[in-house]
Amino acid sequence: MKIATQNQAFFPTSIMEKFEYIKAMGFDGYEIDGRLLVENLDEVKAAIKATGLPVTTACGGYDGWIGDFIEERRLNGLQQIERILEALAEVGGKGIIVPAAWGMFTFRLPP
């Protein structure tokens, strides 16, 4: 079994140091923040090559939700998710985690 981790607040901020830290803790992969990946793609590629630690998936890193009732926000989220998936493909990642919308639908749903 292989075990990966998401980014955590106590991890180093430098991308290379982050990868080295995760590898030193014994993890087999890294579930990266989508925005971090897209905005630092070349640096992430270099860290993967240097450490051998793969980016397996991405979680978060987009501003809209795919189920948002406001069309503009939904489309914005989809565009950002598309960029994240393209970047993931470049580093060999397998997919993106799209968690629940933290109550965004509660104003539309009955109690």
Model-derived regions: residue spans:
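A short, Lys/Arg-enriched amphipathic alpha-helix followed by its capping loop at the start of a domain
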Residues: 1-3, 21-28
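Acidic (Asp/Glu)-rich catalytic clusters
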Residues: 19-24, 38-59, 82-93
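Short, histidine-centered active-site or binding-site loop motifs used for metal coordination
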Residues: 26, 61-62, 100-102
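Short, mixed-charge, low-aromatic patches
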Residues: 1-4, 34-41, 80-81
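Short, Lys/Arg-rich amphipathic segments at extreme N-termini
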Residues: 3-18
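Acidic-and-aromatic substrate-binding clefts and catalytic sites of carbohydrate-active enzymes
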Residues: 10-14, 31-43, 65-68, 104-108
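Hydrophobic faces of well-ordered beta-strands that scaffold small-molecule active sites
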Residues: 2-7, 30-32, 55-60, 96-98
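Active-site acidic/histidine proton-transfer and metal-coordination neighborhood
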Residues: 71-111
